């Protein structure tokens, strides 16, 4: 029940909940200033979200909306890789929906748009696209080890094809 209470507080922009969230983020950043470990959790959904933002030319959706859709995509990818359950993905979807956040990319965005734009992400290293995946709820890691078939299936599903 506490997650539902906190969720309601965040969705109504409760000042304490927002302040506490900012403090948690600051603590995570301080614990991992070089983005080598636990800080990856803060980037969950950003590879997909940044592609959405770029596709929309940084208009129509704010950063958090793009990252919201990206977070669900990252969770779905994590499930396809066997790290989190379908039920956990459904829980993430429900939380995002209850906050009125997008859970799918713009309808006009296609698989090739994602692939092209994701190659521009700051996490690309030596030409290898890296994404943040959930190893479990609350635990994330940056990886380049995502089979192309899993990524393509995710993008096709997200883009309605």
Feature locations, PLM:
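Single conserved hydrophobic/aromatic residue that forms the stacking wall/gate
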Residues: 1-12
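Flexible, glycine/charged-enriched surface loops at secondary-structure junctions
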Residues: 13, 33-41, 61, 84-89, ...
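Oxyanion-binding "anion nests"
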Residues: 13-60
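Short alpha-helical scaffolding segments that buttress acidic/His motifs in well-ordered protein cores
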Residues: 17-25, 71, 96, 118
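Short amphipathic alpha-helical interaction patches enriched in hydrophobic/aromatic residues
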Residues: 25-33, 52, 56, 75, ...
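Residue-level signal for inorganic ion chemistry
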Residues: 46, 71, 137
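Internal helical hairpin/lid segments
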Residues: 49, 53-91
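C-terminal charged capping/lid subdomain of soluble metabolic enzymes
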Residues: 83-161
